[in-house]
From Swiss-Prot:
Keyword Cytoplasm included in the entry's annotation: yes
Database matches in Pfam families: Septin (PF00735)
Binding-site residues, GTP: 50-57, 105, 186-194, 240, 255
Protein's UniProt name: Septin-10
Region (G3 motif): 102-105
Gene Ontology biological process terms, A to Z: cytoskeleton-dependent cytokinesis; protein localization
Organism: Rattus norvegicus (Rat)
Protein role: Filament-forming cytoskeletal GTPase. May play a role in cytokinesis (Potential).
Cross-referenced PANTHER family: SEPTIN
Subcellular location: Cytoplasm; Cytoplasm, Cytoskeleton; Cell projection, Cilium, Flagellum
Region (G4 motif): 185-188
GO molecular function list: GTP binding; GTPase activity; molecular adaptor activity
């Protein structure tokens, strides 16, 4: 199976070159492109990474010869945050939309372990916003404000020793997401000999730790020589200042010290001119292209691969977007059916488990009901037995009462004389018996009433 490069080479070999018989007019295409680009304008986004007070804002002001009036940052920020500001600049008839992203509070925390993470997240968020705009059905990239970072100016403190661990971690995290240009800030604070040793030490550490910084391109013959020479001067040692001081007969941007003057645009004093030449005058468009063709494409490819889109099938066969879409659609449909079947089985299983629980609860309730019913019946039988016994006692008592009421008359008819002789004694005995009968009758009535209440 031929690779894509072989296919393109084969097509190129079958392309015929012809000589035109006259003027057509497509020679004006470069002019058309220039006119359209001038009409649209350009955008350029710079990320400045460095600790607070290292001179980021001053250098940006000096690079574009403009006072952007950024707010001063505090040294007591609890976390790192990024502050983006966009400006409209115009030079001759060329308009530039410049966005400067400053890292506020970078390196000011005691725990610097995650100081680089907000920077990585910001760059990824800009890539994601552009990708979402690109994936829309109705895209508007012509009017879309591209906020992707084109270059990262990484400011290194002029310690004269080596890179800090935070600097290595940060640059290592950013080198596959943005074009990094390392800068030695405030280069006028160390001597020239120390500066050269410091440059060599920094480049050696970057190579050893595998940090990929931006290399000025040498594939274009018009800029290959100067770019190749400038690659040997990295990292640039820079000084920034908007103050103008009179040197000789002219005013120059410089910094005044008791021991002398450091001229910003003097190549013998610092590398500011080299930085401006490489960043703005020569390689600004290459930085924009590298951001789109390399870093953004890497992010886009990873995102599409996460979504399941691939260019080559299992048999190293090129796949079109439609084929990939159909394959993913078939895969998702199968996955959905499988999950639906799993959910149905899970639902049936849970229904069975719930039914078993309910049946067990029903059996327990039925057993409890039968137990209570049996107890109630036993209690009722006991009460019925007590009621029957009380009724029998009541009937016996009534008979006894009737017998007691007839007893005095029978005694009078059988023995009148004895009654008269014992008149007083019998009257007393009759009254006592009558009272006892009344008391017994009341007790029986109260007992019957109490039993009926218990039965009710």
């Amino acid at each position: 199976m031929a690779s894509c490069d072989e296919v393109r080479q084969l097509k190129k070999e079958h392309t015929r070159s012809l000589t035109m018989c006259g003027h057509v007019g497509f020679e004006s295409l470069p002019d058309q492109l220039v006119d359209r680009s001038i009409e649209q304008g350009f955008c350029f986004n710079i990320l400045c990474v460095g600790e607070t007070g290292i001179g980021k804002s001053t250098l940006i002001n000096t690079l574009f010869n403009t006072n952007f009036e950024e707010l001063e940052s505090s040294h007591f920020c609890p976390c790192v945050r990024l502050r983006a500001q966009t400006y409209e600049l115009q030079e001759s008839n060329v308009r530039l939309k410049l966005t400067i992203v400053n890292t506020v509070g970078f390196g000011d925390q005691i725990n610097k372990e995650e100081s680089y993470q907000p920077i990585v997240d910001y760059i990824d968020n800009q890539f994601e916003a552009y990708l979402q705009e690109e994936l829309k059905i109705k895209r508007a990239l012509f009017n879309y404000h591209d906020s992707r970072i084109h270059v990262c100016l990484y400011f290194i403190a002029p310690t004269g020793h080596s890179l800090r661990t935070l600097d290595l971690l940060t640059m290592k995290s950013l080198d596959n997401k943005v074009n990094i240009i390392p800068l030695i800030a405030k280069a006028d604070t160390i001597s020239k000999s120390e500066l050269q040793k410091f440059k060599m030490k920094l480049m050696s550490e970057l190579v050893i730790n595998g940090v990929q910084i931006y290399q000025f391109p040498t594939d274009d013959d018009t800029t290959a020589k100067i770019n190749g020479a400038m690659n040997g001067h990295l990292p640039f040692a820079v000084v920034g200042s908007m103050d103008e001081i009179k040197v000789g007969n002219k005013m120059v941007k410089a910094r005044q010290y008791p021991w002398g003057i450091v001229q910003v645009e003097n190549e013998n004093h610092c590398d500011f001119v080299k930085l401006r030449e490489m960043l703005i005058c020569t390689n600004m468009e290459d930085l924009r292209e590298q951001t789109h063709m390399r870093h953004y494409e890497l992010y886009r490819r990873c995102k599409l691969q996460e979504m399941g889109f691939i260019d080559i099938g299992p048999e190293n066969k090129p796949l079109s977007l439609q084929e990939t879409y159909e394959a993913k659609r078939h895969e998702f449909c199968g996955e959905r059916q499988r999950k639906e079947e799993q959910m149905k089985q899970m639902f049936v299983q849970r229904v069975k488990e719930k039914e078993a629980i309910l049946k067990e609860a029903e059996r327990e309730l039925q057993a409890k009901f039968e137990h209570l019913k049996r107890i109630h019946q036993e209690e009722r039988m006991k009460l019925e037995e007590k009621r029957r016994m009380l009724e029998e006692e009541s009937v016996a008592f009534a008979k006894k009462k009737a017998t007691c009421e007839l007893f005095p008359h029978q005694s009078f008819l059988a023995s009148g004389s004895s009654i008269r002789r014992d008149k007083d004694r019998k009257k007393t005995d009759g009254a006592s018996a009558f009272c006892d009968c009344i008391t017994a009758q009341e007790n029986v009535r109260l007992c019957i009433s109490s039993q009926r209440k218990e039965m009710d």
